[in-house]
Amino acid sequence: MSEPFQPADARRFEAALRRFDQENARDPNQETADGVAQPRELLYARRLNDRVLRLCPDASEPLRLAARCQHLCRWEIARSSYPMTRAGYLQWRATLKKFHAQKAGDILRELGYPEDVVHRVQDLNLKKNFPDDPETRVLEDALCLVFLEYQLADLAAKTAGDKTINALQKSWQKMTPTARAEALKLNYGPHEKALLERALKA
């Protein structure tokens, strides 16, 4: 049986999670979960955090922090501020990664985290050394599973089937066998299940 998680400084760790949640609670976009409307990025952060801990109960402090701030204040840089092209999308995503990492680093430094921890969290935010870094793989697995469980239905409803299948295939390629097994256990609607089956057969 593994030892209970013990952060280097419990008060500092809890303060960091609170700060991340406070920032994400400002999201003007709402999403309903269990019948309650919640700030979208706050809900996303908690779902990602939960999935990381289910995949890796012994997750390190930097990985736990990274899971909680991966999309920190994402709404502040709108997709519409970049060209509505593939190149524009990629530029937007690259900018967001740096933005999240910078904001997370600012908060962690303010709370007194040492630079090695700050840099480690930012490296995870930026998904550096993927797929060689085991913790980055856990984070990517969790990101893919949150997408499949909570975002696939919305994407499938708004996007052409071939594009959704392409997104599914890209996610599947990045996932470990453990995450793929978890993905197959998720409850999908008939349309989403059919798309996933097509993606895996292609």
Describe the role of every protein-language-model region.
Residues S2-R18, Q22, G35-L42, R46, ...:
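Divalent metal-dependent phosphate-bond-processing catalytic cores, especially two-metal-ion Mg2+/Mn2+ enzymes
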Residues A66, S81, R86-A94, E192-A202:
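Long, low-complexity, intrinsically disordered polar/charged segments
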Residues S80-D123:
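Helix-adjacent hinge/juxtasegments
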Residues E61-S80, H100, A104, D123-N129, ...:
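His-Asp-centered metal-binding catalytic motifs of divalent-metal-dependent phosphohydrolases/nucleases
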Residues H71-A78, Q91-T95, H119, V138-A142:
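Membrane-targeting and insertion segments and their boundary/processing signals
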Residues Q22-E31, P83-M84:
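Short, charged, low-complexity loops and linkers
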Residues T32-V36, A87-R93, P134:
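A ubiquitous short alpha-helical element
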